[in-house]
Amino acid sequence: RGDRSLTLRPENTASVVRSYLENAIYGKEDVTKYYYNGSMFRYERPQAGRQREFNQIGVEVLGESSPILDAEVIAMSYSLLEKLGITDLEVHINSVGTNASRTKYREMLLNFLEPMKEELCEDCRMRMEKNPLRVLDCKVDKCKELTKDAPSIIDSLNEEERAHYETVKKYLDIFGVKYVEDS
């Protein structure tokens, strides 16, 4: 208020990456793993059920891209929640691939949605223009029913991306993480 400036962190990933870069940790370690827990803040008006201040627990792995590390992060987070007494967990996984795969999926999804466009709610028709993936998030029962057989984003992955995804699933099975595949 007034002439004062107050900075509150909206999330912690940027802080971790900044520290990693500013301290040249990337030159010292092949893989660096971080975890954090703390209060984060939203400036904009929060959506229903959300608060301006919230607690975030996060895990970051920097220095290497690996499906085994992806599975390890998921398994570690899963284990933490179980140890905190949170039971009946359901982990949902998928892969959005690269920009090329996302572009391919966007086209697949639009081809699927176009014949039913007039049956979709007004919000979904607008979403088709801006971000067709959002149509799959619609809460309107009729739209949910119309999109239940939409193509899976997994079908747009190239061979390397699909192998990465399959390896993540393999290691989640090894680590004993129960998961559901979302398309």
Show the residue positions of the predicted features.
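TRNA-recognition modules of translation machinery and tRNA-sensing kinases, especially anticodon-binding
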Residues: 1-183
